[in-house]
Design a protein with these regions (language model features):
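Charged phosphate-binding loop/patch that engages nucleotide di/tri-phosphates or the phosphate backbone
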Residues: 145-165
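Short secondary-structure junctions
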Residues: 77-84
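A cytosolic small-molecule/anion-sensing beta-strand core signal
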Residues: 18
């Protein structure tokens, strides 16, 4: 029997940075969690995200978060992430309205200023490339603004900070 105390969804979100601005997206009003709020692209890890792939060692799959985030970014906002290194920003746990706990890991990546255009999936209704000041004008899910602050300070000073209000 599985111990429900040990079960969590694992969610990876991404802060995409282009020309010093962050990509934020608005959730559809019909979404179960945080309807109509502004957030970051990302999604849940599923077993099929790795088990159909060849293992990287005899026992393990590597880069699972990175591969998941690349797929979710392509599905949700139509941007293809080619190569690149994701950086860790923050992690948190959230209990959804349906009582399922979610471990959320937030990563960031700078993307080139190329010809790719954002194309939203049906679960998202709007997007913005926003700097910190512009992000204040959007109804962000609580805590996301602080994640953007952490990343902004890291980009400007090289200092890595922990999340805090």
């Amino acid at each position: 029997m599985v111990d429900r105390n040990l079960l969590h969804y694992i969610v990876v979100t991404g802060i995409l940075i282009k020309n010093g601005k962050f990509l934020i997206v608005k959730r559809a009003d019909w979404e179960k969690a945080f309807p109509g709020k502004w957030t970051l692209p990302g999604g849940k890890l599923e077993v099929l995200d790795y088990v159909l792939r060849q293992k990287d060692t005899s026992d393990h799959w590597y880069n699972v978060f990175e591969d998941l985030l690349k797929r979710e970014i392509l599905e949700e906002v139509g941007l293809e992430i080619k190569g690149g290194n994701f950086d860790y920003v923050a992690s948190m746990v959230y209990i959804r309205p349906d009582k399922i706990p979610c471990l959320i890991v937030n990563l960031s990546i700078e993307i080139p200023d190329d010809e790719q255009n954002v194309r939203l999936c049906p679960a998202l209704t709007d997007f913005a490339w926003a700097d910190l000041e512009e992000a204040k004008n959007h109804d962000l899910i609580e805590g996301i603004y602080e994640e953007l602050e952490i990343l902004d300070k890291k980009l400007k000073t090289g200092k890595v900070l922990e999340w805090g209000k």
